[in-house]
Amino acid sequence: PVGAFVANAKFAKAMEPGDHGSTYGGNPLVTAAVSTVFDILKKDSIVENCKEVSEYLLEELDKVVKDYDCVVGHRGLGLMQGIVLNVPAKKYVQALLDEGVIVVTAGEKVIRLLPPLVITKEHVDEFITKLRKVLA
């Protein structure tokens, strides 16, 4: 684990060594790993991909909302989305799992999506096809 935070001068002056931190959180190995992750995120345009694919996902989810009475909407941020139903989500989650799609419930009536950052539009298409299949 590793973390960082920024404090203005007023709060920084009030802190002493040991007030905030982790025993293992800032060692050289961990910081090297974090640095490498940031390099990969930049080199592979991961953030840009997330923005592009999340916009596509939202467009496709909007279509699902219009096409199925049991789907009342979706909510979330970027790729992290909840598909809001007006019926219990459990059977749909199980059906999606049976189709090889990893989702979970978030409360009784929400199917939660939390795809990897390297998701593609083709993955979204596959998900939407399987979602439509289980909703039918």
Regions found by a protein language model. Give the residues of each.
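Conserved N-terminal phosphate-binding loop of PLP-dependent enzymes in the Aspartate aminotransferase
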Residues: P1-A136
